[in-house]
């Protein structure tokens, strides 16, 4: 039950799926499993990897790249990458981006012939864009902070799961924040250039909802239709993924409607506890879909380390906790 889960550590794992192009990429029941990545392999490690999540796929020439968040129990998340040319043999996963603060949601894209990444950097109070500095996509440099938290503007959660969609020469940026009510609030900005000044859309916030207010991947155009994936957070964080079709997107208009709820079927054991990411590409004449899923583990030493960390914080800062 829920009481038992509160005594456990919430973890995430990744699963890559393949589907025929004739099948809807939203129907994971028609897929077969390509690859899985899990944490918790270092059973005797004091700082084990507990989260591998937020997978994003990116195709460059004949190579498929998988970027994802990897987080250990006591340290902030970093961005890792692995790649393949045949879907069978994958390169050794490498840390490609690390900061002093938490990183996740590594959305990778191209613009004007260059490769960029917009990871989640909300704990820094900003939305950042990094540029790849080599052809292997293993090195990245900060190019610009697109948006920064205004002075004195207090959010309970700032700038999460951000991505950009270019349409008719305009760059539309979506990001999720939470204000005093702790409800997921989807904000929309736009600019006439990737590195330009982003102004808030007149209809922003465009969504205020625990059901569809937080993105679960980037916007994707499939068979001529533009889709947005969102997390179901009604009962708990990252419970499942919904799909909405965006029917109007201009500098003055925005419309979307829900087309599919709960992509992850509870009939599939891997997704028993839900998931919060959905991303796809066409590669080798099929759909390749990146998903993640939640799981819970009772790690005694992890609970001890958490309590020790809290004790040390209280000792150093008497008012803590």
Describe each region flagged by the PLM.
Residues 170-191, 211-246:
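Loop/turn-rich, solvent-exposed surfaces of beta-rich toroidal or solenoidal domains
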Residues 55-71, 107-123, 128-130, 146, ...:
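Hydrophobic core segments of beta-strands in well-ordered, beta-rich domains
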Residues 9-25, 74-82, 124-131, 181-190, ...:
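Structural motif
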Residues 84-88, 133-137, 192-195, 247-249:
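Short loop/turn segments that connect beta-strands within beta-propeller blades
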Residues 1-4:
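Short, small-residue-biased leader/transition segments that mark boundaries at the very start
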Residues 15-58, 73-74, 88-110, 119, ...:
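Surface loop/turn signatures of beta-propeller and other carbohydrate-active proteins
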